[in-house]
Every structure is written in structure tokens, then in C-alpha cells.
From Swiss-Prot:
This is Co-chaperone protein HscB homolog. Co-chaperone involved in the maturation of iron-sulfur cluster-containing proteins. Seems to help targeting proteins to be folded toward HscA. Transmembrane segments: none annotated. The lineage of its organism: Bacteria, Pseudomonadati, Pseudomonadota, Gammaproteobacteria, Vibrionales. CDD domains: DnaJ. The gene is hscB.
Amino acid sequence: MNHFELFGLPSQFQLDGSLLSSQFRELQKRFHPDNFATASERDRLMAVQKAAQINDAYQVLKHPISRAEYILAENGTEIRGEQQTMQDPMFLMEQMELREELEDIADSSDPESALFDFDSKVSKMYKQHLASVEQELDQGLWAEAADRVRKLKFIAKLKNEIELVEDKLLG
């Protein structure tokens, strides 16, 4: 049983987040180890394992990048943990330029405003790549989707770096 089947969801990238959450809460209640306190040792162990499986599956499906990686793996394209280098020099150059731009924000005349504008630009880029991943996965374009997920991971890391700069500026 795959993660989508576990939650009774269609096996596709686009999913209903509120339905995922409600199914998660329902499964958590049903397989909570306390419900098996008087059961046999074997049944208690199975309940603990099922609860762990439910939690793991929820974490994977809840986040778009891990959900895309999971769908790719389910379709024979494993990219988790791989050390494949990015093959798109234009994208890598753009990422380097964006990181330089982020570094320069602290020295700008209005760093808060500059950071807001920069964050908006990066968020737009993230959403565009996410929409492309969805299309590529829906069309079964596994290699293209895998490449796009690699790019999304770069952008997500940049978004985290933006949050760190924001914390420094506001803190």
C-alpha cells in the first residue's frame, strides 16, 4: 500500500491538504498505541509500526517537494539522496546571482523593503516551478519532473536563506 492509498487519496501530485489532514487525524486515532494497551504484544507492536508508517507518509505527502520525490520514486525515478549535479548552467548561474543579491540586501538603503521584494520574486519563481512539476508529473514526464524537483530544492533552500536574513534584520 503506497502513501496515497493509506490516506485514501488519488495518487497524484495535486492533493486536498485539508482532506489529507483529516484522514491523518482519523488514522492517528484509529491506530494510536493507547488503543492497543490491552492487546497482545504482537498487536501492540503492529499498532506502533502502523502509527509510524502513518506519520512518515503524512510528512512526505504534506510537503510538495517530498511528495514529488515520492511520486517519482513510485514511478522508477529515484532522486532522494542522489549526488547528481545540476546539468543546467543557466539555472546555476541564476542561483548564484540570486544569492549574491540576497547578500547585498543587508547593505541596501532600505533592507526590509529590498528583502520583501526579493522574497516576492523568489516565491513567484518557486510557484512557477511547482506548477511545472505538477504538469510534468501529470504527464508522466519523469526525467523532466526530476530535473525540476532538483531546481525546486535549490529555490526552497534560497527561501530558507531569505528567512535567516529576515531574522537577522528583524532581530
